Amino acid sequence: VLRWGDTELAPPGPGEVRIRHGAIAVNYSDVNVREGGFYIAKPLKFPVIIGNEAAGVIEELGAGAEGVQVGMRAAYVGVGGPFYENTGAYAEARNVPASCLFKLPDKISDDQAAAMMLKGLTASMVIHRYCKPQPGDAVLIHGAASGVGLLLVQWCKHLGATVIGTVGSETKAEVARSLGCDHTILYRDVDFVSAVKEIVPDGVAAVLDGVGKDTFAQSIYCTRRYGMLVNYGNASGHPDPLDLLLLAKHGSLIVTRPAFSDHIRDAHDRAHYSDELYDLAASGVLKVKIGKSYPLSQTAEAHRDLEGRKYAGSLLLKP
């Protein structure tokens, strides 16, 4: 249950800043926190303010807050602790550690930042640490019209890959194709394994999966010898346990399930990957698709639309 209401916000503590939100991201992890699902390391004491990602402007500094100033534009993705426990972005303003902030350049708007920081850095993690396709490689992207999926479609296409995407509707297929997806598969209507094999008989070099339970197990049969499966999200639920012998049987496959927080743990990495993301977005290599924006008071509607997979791209809340 989501309720709209007022709460008092204390002054920022030592090392913290108060950030006035301009745009707030709606992510599947927020739904999971709301439901008390598998991401949670320990039970939450409800009620809580959920949300992990937002962009805005710093309006007050706590003692000892370094590297920041009042009036600076910034974004954050988590606040440095357990990613799905230290929530609180679904608010007009919030106190966060200065150390968790990404400074925003003028070329990136609040809406762009909120729509792409978690999703874009997730795509960056997949590309740089696990699967950087070579020109001519075929890649299968599940949920190709999602926020992360659309960024992966564009990034893989930019690197010269043949991109195959699964989507839930023809409308989403059109969006994915418009941003570079070479082949789209309506996975609810056809067997996506057979459809992939018709396009690439030997299988794809990599499967990039943010859907999870509905797609991951069958993806083994889409992958070529020595291929890789990357599960980076679980929109349909956590994948079932995997028999490791299947990986040997179907071509010495590699499977990984990375943690986003590890990708941005190092300060140098945070700066490097965020700067790259800003440049790719500003140059038009990555176009950030915003499916819909909602007033913050209509958060429940935004969650219903996200769970119903109603829109392609990212959903935002506007304070």
Which role does the model predict for each range below?
Residues 75, 140, 205-208, 230:
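N-terminal Rossmann-like NAD(P) cofactor-binding module of classical short-chain dehydrogenase/reductase
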Residues 113-190:
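Mid-domain Rossmann-like dinucleotide-binding core that forms the NAD(H)/NADP(H) cofactor-binding site
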Residues 159, 167, 214-286, 319:
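Glycine-rich phosphate-binding loop and adjacent beta-alpha segment
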Residues 191-201:
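Short amphipathic alpha-helix with an adjacent loop that forms part of the alpha/beta core around
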Residues 283-292, 300-319:
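C-terminal capping/lid region of NAD(P)-dependent oxidoreductase domains
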